[in-house]
Structure formats: structure tokens, C-alpha cells
Amino acid sequence: MNTLAGSLRIGRLELDNGLVILVNERPDSELIVITGSSLAGAVFDGRKRPGLSQFTSGMMMRGTKKRKYMQIVDQTESLGAGIRFHADDDLAWSSSRCTTSSLDKTVELLFDCMMNPTFPEAEIEKVRGLMLTNIKEREDSTQAVAQRIAREMLFPEGNPYHSDPGGYEETVNAITREDVAGFWDQQCGPESTILSFSGRITLAEVEKKTKLLSRDWDARHPRPKVPPVEVLRPIKATRRVVPMMHKSQVDIVVMCQAVARSHPDNYALASANVILGRLGLMGRLGKNIRDKQGLAYYATCSYSPRITGGYWTAFAGVDPANVDKALDSMKHEMAEISRNPVSKAEHRDAATHQVGSLALKLESAQSAAAFMHGIEIHGLGLDFVDRYEDIVNSVSREDMRRVCQEYLRTEEACTAVVGPCQA
């Protein structure tokens, strides 16, 4: 029995200007969620402008040709709605929430922000200040610093995934209004944008509203292409220690290059990641390093497939006295899953976990609206959810062992150790 069949019905249309519209009708939901994405993430920042995508996203509500910043804020609040913008590695996102009664005004506000930003100089400086504060906070977090350093070691300078998406003090200080306006013009047109709607609304209603609001929104450039991520192998294993003596905990990050979301090995890596870091709360890593040995406050892992590349990351927070033992145990688990097939019970539980997690996720209009973007961006097909259970169940124990042997190579992993320890 396919437990996911029929759980996400998607209507799709593409307007003449290239804007893609996705609709998940939920007749019983008074809440409507609108999620937007554009090919305008950090991979487009360039070597000299890390942080530009997040800077641009931070400016999208800061004033338009029709409204000043506080007018946008006041009107959004008066509707009981919410609109926000942010950016990640590949994409710039908008997230909007409203009720059916406030839909028309909320959508008009959203389109005004997307189509008509003016990037006032005074607001540029406010957003710059916020970003610099975020950077200072990031650089005082042992986990955030460890993740940044591991990523910078794993992906060489010039690689689209080398730099922190939030930028650095010197690059954020150097970004100008012209940089922001130029980035928006180049990356954020309708030809680059997807809008998904989830709630009590039909495809026909969305088509009527979006055609009217975007009638003057013309495609300005060809659809952007995400820069390719060159995988340089063999990668030399690298370890870097950063002392932060005012902290009480050491954070360890071990990172390996993985694959793009569209790669055939994606599903096997995702299943292996569940076994290593999810089952039983924190997977094999947590069970061994935290529960059995008592070496860590937490130990887990994550898998991050992107449009043209990806990475796998193991994390642990430990007492300074346990750094070497914990790191050895992390690498032991990586080697073990690469040498020997997982148990039949783990294999079954990993598939059940993934199917159940998706079923739970799709109960939320917000999660469903975001999930539709992945389906569109990666070309998975509108029936992807119906096929997902069969896809996950087709991953074998040997598939998982093979991909772990290929990608979770301890001899190529980049390790960052940050906290009260000596370099």
C-alpha cells in the first residue's frame, strides 16, 4: 500500500513572462501559504561579493515605488499576514502567510516587493548593520565557526559553495546600493521565479490574480544557470583547530563532498544519513558517541544536496577533554557504514522514517508549499510524491554501503575543531 498516494496534488502553469505557478488546493484550510523562490542564492554572489544574495533579500521589503518600508510593515500587520525574504546557497526565498479574506491585498503587497524594490540608501545601511551583527554573532558560535571553516576547507576558493552565504565583515562593508540593485535585476526576474500556493484557493483563481499583478513584469534576462560545482578528487584530509578559550564546549564538524539533488546516488545517501544521524533520535553517531561512550552532548549528521553539488556533515559537541576520542568515534562510524551493509532492521526503519517524515511534512500547508519548489526546480515530476515510497524502498543495503564508501571517505574529510582547545 502506498501511504503517500494522493497526499500532494499539484496544479502547474507557466505565464508568458516565465513565472511558474504551483497550486496545492486545500479546501478545508483557511490559511493560505505562498512561497516564492528565485535563482538568486549565494552561489551567484561571486568571489568578491559573499553576502550579496542575503543583502539583496534583506532589502526586498525595505521600500518600493509605491510604499515605504514602514507602510509595508503596517499594511502587512493590519492584514494579520506575514511576508519575509531570505536566501540560502542556491535560492532566494519569499514566505507569505494570510487568510482567504486577506489574500488579494497580501498578494498585491508581495508582488509590489518582488517587482518594484527601490533599495533606499538609508535602508541599505540598516540592513548592512543587521548583517554585520549577524556575522559577529556567527563568529562567536563554536558550531557556526566550525561549519564555516570546514566548508571553506572542503570547497576551494572560487567554488560556488566555498564562502559563507552570510558573507564576511569586509565583503558586507564593501557592498553598494548599485551591487544590490544590479543583483536583483540580473537574478530576480519572472524568468527565474517560482510561486507556490497552498490553501483554500484554486489554480484558476491564482492564474487570474497573478496574470493581473504581473502584467508589467517582463522577463529581463535568460533564466540563470546555477554555477557548476567542480569536485576535485582526491581531496586531502585537512584538520583545523580554532581556539575560543572563553567557551565551555568544543564543537567538531567533519564534512565531505556529496552529490547534487538530481544525482542517482542521492536517495542512497539520504537513507544512509538517516541511519547515521536520525534513527533513535541521533542515529548511530548519537547512540555510540553520546549514549554508549558519554563523549558528547550531542552527535548527529546532515546531508545537504543542492542543485549542482552537495555535502555531508557530521557534528558533535564535546567536553574539551574528549575531542580526540569523539573525533575517532565519528570517523569510525563513517568507516563502518562504508565497509559493511546496514542491518535489515535499519534498512527497513530508514525507509519507514523517510516516508513517515514526508507524510507528516505534507500535512502542513507551509511545508507543502516549500516542498513543491524542490519538485519543480529539480524536475522531479508532479507525481513525485506518489512515487516517493517506491523510490525509497528501491534503495538497497548495498546501495547505501557503496555510496558511503564513495563519498564518506575519512581520508578526504575536512575537520574543524572550535572551542576551548589549543591549536
Task: Identify the residue ranges that each predicted region occupies.
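Carbohydrate-associated surface elements
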Residues: 200
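C-terminal hydrophobic structural anchor segments
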Residues: 348-381
